[in-house]
UniProtKB/Swiss-Prot annotation:
Organism annotation: Methanothermus fervidus (strain ATCC 43054 / DSM 2088 / JCM 10308 / V24 S)
Protein name, UniProt field: Malate/(S)-sulfolactate dehydrogenase
UniProt gene name: mdh
Subcellular compartments: Cytoplasm
Subunit structure: Homodimer.
This protein's record includes keyword NAD: yes
Amino acid sequence: MIISPEEERSLIIKILNALGVSEEHAKITADVIVDADLKGFTSHGIGRFPQYVEGIKLGTIKTSGNIEIEKETDSVALINGNHLLGQVVAYKGMKLAIEKAKNTGVGIVGIHDSNHFGIAGYYSDMAMKNDMIGITMTNTEPAVAPLGGKIPVLGTNPIAISIPSNEYYVAVDMSTAAVARGKLLEAARKNEKIPEGIAVDKNGNPTTDPNEALNGSILPFGGHKGYALCFMIEILAGPLVKAEFGSKVKGTVDPSQMCTKGDLLIAIDPSKFYDIEEFKRNVDEFVKEIKSTGKDVLIPGDRERMNIKKREKEGIELDKKLVEKLKEIADELNIELTW
């Protein structure tokens, strides 16, 4: 089934409103979810939405309240998200980081006691749209075993970086595991196999079964280099921001548990180094040089840009099981679907 971005956004807002979420918070959450689907990160789009609905019903995600700034300097802040929707907390966290960067050149905001926030790239893009460099990191429930180990104690730990440019969308949003766990959940829902070489079962044997992988371990991307980056993000989005880490991280997949992961949001103002327009021209020049080396050379962000253009025109495809689940949620809340 195919729906328009507007239909998806409207449904999410209606459901969240019916569950007691304010219009402001519902719109923020819907924007992040639709952005994920438009960019092609369908494992973190509306396919993940039923998890949030379940968390709200169970009380692990709070529908109302405010974030609390626990500690603050001119360039740094630590936020307690008070278990609100993760999209809302991260959005407000990056807004604060951007404001700090306007004054000092850099804003760094750490978050704990929040929830799964969807795609990391949305928040980095917020900085980019303000002519700043945005960097977002988060940790997750354990899914990745250390190199040489068999027991998952690391999250998939994504990192996203967005850079302002006049002519291009320059951005990367990636898991530091060989695959995001959301991709495994999506493959399991669709009864699809996963590629070889990205996961092992609970006995350490290679598997293409997403369910065995979910009960086993995802491999780090890029061998020891990916493992090292995953390890470092666990610290930057865990101990640094007063959040849990390793086997103590809960609630990013299982909505029955209070979420204990952390986020680190960074905004850097290039204009504090030199003229912002000159910086963006230099970025454009570099991209042109990269693209001049071959006919089909892509830069980080090209695939997302092409996906957005395609899906804004053609719509967002939903699989049968997801449609059934969304209809079930809507029926429970007496919401009439328009599609």
